[in-house]
């Protein structure tokens, strides 16, 4: 994927628990394969949200970040997901691993159905730099999205 640039642009490639409407966020679980703030051209984040680690009064989410040339060419964002860990990569370079612990479902809701969301948002209270009014049009370019196995997703 090639990330757009511009103050207030917020592309994300993520996975959300399919029971979101029944149990709500963050109980459903969220895996951000990649998030990017358009005002920070080369900085991307891979983040794990759940009932224990979240921005709703829990412990701040576990996040891995990297400085890559996100806006100037296609990059491959990847999560390897198995029953005990989530490993994050950009262009094959390892970012970090989130491990299942003995804390139960509050720390590991990742043993249920999830669905993929590829989106480009504009503005948010999470934006570190505000939003420009004259940055449009913008686009998030995705060459392909591949599910390698039932719990492994690769987006490029």
How would you name each of these model-derived features?
Residues 1-156:
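GH16 jelly-roll
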